[in-house]
């Protein structure tokens, strides 16, 4: 398996009019394709003066907290957040995963989706049919007046538990889930 070739081939396919969705498995393996991500995927629109778009979605899973060792436990999204040209999504629920993925597929920019495997077993009712969740629009998970907790991905359920504990101590906690890190909702 060569992540560098997978990313490069997807970039080429996107430049020719396709909208590939690439599953790169573990997010740790994204490092193997850094040259393609940084120098090709992220910069193509800029290098061609806006005449080329790169409508491609790269999915990767974050397996932290499951004793998967060093090679399967990274969360590299902070590095990618600092690369101009990339959009970053971190869904925390099945509804967000579906709505954000539909939006990502429609975008003309490259999107990296970081999915926490701890959430894969989560169940909830999801709206039938097509719907989209716009990038850069946070979700208020819980209203509160005393403190705000900002959490992403699998930290959102943990934040809900923390807010419930705080509530027993008379502290009202608001929980915000940004859903996308690039663009980040300015609230």
Language-model regions, residue ranges each:
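Generic long, charged, amphipathic alpha-helical segments
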Residues: 164, 168-187
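Conserved thiamine diphosphate
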Residues: 2-5, 11-150, 154-158, 173
């Amino acid at each position: 398996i060569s992540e560098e070739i997978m990313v490069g081939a997807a970039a080429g396919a996107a430049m020719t009019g396709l909208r590939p969705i690439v599953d790169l498995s573990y997010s740790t393996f994204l490092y193997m394709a850094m040259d393609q991500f940084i120098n090709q995927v992220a910069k193509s629109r800029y290098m061609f003066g806006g005449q080329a778009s790169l409508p491609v979605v790269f999915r990767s899973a974050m397996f932290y907290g499951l004793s998967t060792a060093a090679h399967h436990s990274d969360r590299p999204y902070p590095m990618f957040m600092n690369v101009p040209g990339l959009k970053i999504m971190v869904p925390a629920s099945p509804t967000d995963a579906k709505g954000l993925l539909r939006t990502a597929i429609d975008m003309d920019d490259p999107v990296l989706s970081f999915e926490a495997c701890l959430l894969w077993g989560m169940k909830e009712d999801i709206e039938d049919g097509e719907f989209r969740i716009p990038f850069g629009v946070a979700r208020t998970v819980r209203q509160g007046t005393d403190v705000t907790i900002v959490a992403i991905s699998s930290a959102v359920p943990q934040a809900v538990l923390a807010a419930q504990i705080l509530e027993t101590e008379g502290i009202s906690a608001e929980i915000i889930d940004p859903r996308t890190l690039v663009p980040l909702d300015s609230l």
